[in-house]
Regions:
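A short glycine-rich, His/Asp/Glu-containing loop-to-beta-strand
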Residues: 1-12, 18
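Short beta-strand His + acidic residue motifs that chelate non-heme Fe in jelly-roll/DSBH
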Residues: 11-13, 31-33, 54, 60-65, ...
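Short, surface-exposed beta-strand-loop junctions and turns on beta-sheet-rich folds
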Residues: 18, 37-39, 77-79
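Short glycine/proline-enriched turns and hinge-like loops at secondary-structure junctions
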Residues: 14-16, 23-24, 64-67
Length: 101
């Protein structure tokens, strides 16, 4: 389970090996993905009951629109070396903003 605070998002990223399926079990998200055929960012609101299938190579990102928004993820095995960040998410930006310079 992936549980989000409102207005937090993970980085826009993709995997070359991992195949993912998400089920939205609570709340709402803004689902962002890059259409690799047109090189444009697409967005859609997803909510309880929606399912998303992410094939390898598909850049994706979620922004929680509600507190406690939850994703149930089923996927092939995850390898840290198989995550390729395209755009930073909340945690990367928070860490950057807290640097001492």
């Amino acid at each position: 389970l992936l549980v989000f605070k409102k207005d937090k998002e993970f980085s826009m990223h993709f995997h070359l090996l991992k195949d993912e399926a998400w089920y939205i079990s609570k709340g709402q998200f803004l689902y962002k993905f890059i259409d690799t055929k047109t090189a444009t960012i697409k967005e859609m609101i997803v909510s309880v009951g929606d399912c998303i299938h992410l094939i390898p190579g598909q850049p994706h990102q979620m922004l929680a629109l509600t507190e406690g928004a939850t994703i149930f993820e089923v996927s092939t095995q995850h390898f840290d070396s198989d995550s390729y960040r395209v755009i930073p998410g909340s945690s990367q930006l928070d860490n950057f903003n807290n640097l001492p310079f």
